[in-house]
Amino acid sequence: DSKPLNLVLPKEEPPNNPQTYGGGGGSRKDDFDVVLQGAQEV
């Protein structure tokens, strides 16, 4: 089932979808990490 993920995630790493790779968005990645940290703390 891991193969279909490759089709959904292009190798170009689109800047419009930073969450796709969990990064590549710069500031957005930091915000996303903060959300993850908050969830882990709870």
UniProtKB/Swiss-Prot annotation:
Any one GO CC term of the record: extracellular region
Region (Disordered): 1-31
Subcellular localization(s) per the UniProt record: Secreted
Major subcellular site: secreted
Record has RNA-binding as a keyword: no
Domain of life according to the entry: Eukaryota
Keyword list, A-Z: Antibiotic, Antimicrobial, Fungicide, Immunity, Innate immunity, Secreted
Induction summary: By bacterial infection.
A GO BP annotation: killing of cells of another organism
Protein task: Antimicrobial peptide active against Gram-negative bacterium E.coli and fungus N.crassa. Has no activity against Gram-positive bacterium M.luteus. Active against E.coli and, weakly, against M.luteus.
Family: Belongs to the attacin/sarcotoxin-2 family.
Misc: At least four isoforms with masses ranging from 8886.5 kDa to 9029.0 kDa seem to exist.
The protein's name in its UniProt record: Diptericin
Naturally occurring in which organism (per UniProt): Calliphora vicina
